[in-house]
């Protein structure tokens, strides 16, 4: 069976932790920022851990060899 390719877009957007969780950056920071409060903008900084089902789907379909 041939090797599976990792999706390049997923490599750029997601990272795996040592325990196998999937980390992604917060959504909703690209435009329309003027209608958000300063606290909302601050809270959108950084990363978040995806829920179990989303993380499972990312690892299964987009990062086939990232199954720590």
UniProtKB/Swiss-Prot annotation:
Alphabetized GO MF terms: structural constituent of ribosome
Disulfide bonds: none
Signal sequence coordinates: none
Protein keywords: Ribonucleoprotein, Ribosomal protein
GO BP annotations listed: translation
Family matches, as InterPro entries: Ribosomal_bL35 (IPR001706), Ribosomal_bL35-like (IPR021137), Ribosomal_bL35_CS (IPR018265), Ribosomal_bL35_sf (IPR037229)
GO cellular component: cytosolic large ribosomal subunit
NCBIfam families in UniProt: rpmI_bact
HAMAP family: Ribosomal_bL35 (MF_00514)
Family: Belongs to the bacterial ribosomal protein bL35 family.
Protein name, UniProt field: Large ribosomal subunit protein bL35
Organism listed in the record: Rickettsia canadensis (strain McKiel)
């Amino acid at each position: 069976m041939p090797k599976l390719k990792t999706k390049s877009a997923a490599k750029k957007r997601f990272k795996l932790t040592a325990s196998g969780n999937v980390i992604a950056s917060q959504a909703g920071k690209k435009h329309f920022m003027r209608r958000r409060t300063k606290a909302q903008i601050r809270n959108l900084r950084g990363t978040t851990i995806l829920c179990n089902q989303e993380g499972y789907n990312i690892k299964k379909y987009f990062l086939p060899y990232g199954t720590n």
